[in-house]
Amino acid sequence: MALLQWMLDHVQDEEKNYENLSIDDQHSLFGINRDWLSFLQLSKLEITHLKHVYKLVDNDRVHLTVHPSSDNVHAWSFLCKPTDVKVVILGQDPYPDGRGCGLAFGTVKECSIPESLKNIFKELERSIPNFSPPDNGCLNSWCREGVLLLNSIFTVVHGLPMSHEAFGWQTLSYKIISRLSEQMNSLVFLLWGKHARKLSYLIDAQKHLVLESAHPSPKVKSARMPFIGCNHFVRTNLFLTEHGKDPINWNILNE
């Protein structure tokens, strides 16, 4: 008990030194859209933690190739406003080969389509009428439909998957998930793979629809909850329609 009290007192003393930054200051520091920063209401402690994360990432950029580029790390925040979110698809970390664009599972147009995304397109083609797989992995138009494509870790060193897992990006990604769960109603959360499914505790399943399956990577074999055949895209639109929201036009990638 004495140790616990010391820790509480220490945290309170330390917190006095944490910076209280305006939304504009946070935007300049972190490159996150102001609408999201206003929505998230980051605490002084969270801001301090994030500044440390950025310092670690910047240090790596000095002598290593880090993906995505600084300008694209938070592309998700500019393509889908918090008030427009209807669906959240959770990813892990960016593609370590440079194809990532700041959106979970998405790529820049010029790059080849990763195998995981090919499987996502397969499930769409199987379950959504008239869906035709596009010839690139750019998912920007889904964001404008209200689909938040969010990685839990926002950067990665080239060729080293999960290399920034311990940097502390979860301070931001977990806050985004929990804040959406608290402040919004009738969202759909798609959790694909063990990493994403572990975050279900952040979501109020009484308010939102949480759909889980194996990761779409063809390397993952799951008899219990396979990705192909999960019908998540169909079930998502049924839920949205039942709750008075417009369904997602998954076909918009080809329009």
Curated annotation (Swiss-Prot):
Its EC number is 3.2.2.27. PROSITE patterns: U_DNA_GLYCOSYLASE. It is an enzyme of class 3 (hydrolase). Its main location: host cell. The active site is at D93 (proton acceptor). Coiled coil: none annotated. Gene3D superfamilies: Uracil-DNA glycosylase-like domain (3.40.470.10). It comes from the Viruses. The keyword NADP does not apply. SUPFAM superfamilies: Uracil-DNA glycosylase-like. It is found in: Host nucleus. GO terms for cellular component: host cell nucleus. Pfam families: UDG. Keywords: DNA damage, DNA repair, Host nucleus, Hydrolase. Disulfide bonds: none annotated. One of its GO terms (molecular function) is uracil DNA N-glycosylase activity. One of its GO terms (biological process) is base-excision repair, AP site formation via deaminated base removal. Excises uracil residues from the DNA which can arise as a result of misincorporation of dUMP residues by DNA polymerase or deamination of cytosines. Therefore may reduce deleterious uracil incorporation into the viral genome, particularly in terminally differentiated cells which lack DNA repair enzymes. Belongs to the uracil-DNA glycosylase (UDG) superfamily. UNG family. This is Uracil-DNA glycosylase. The gene is U81.
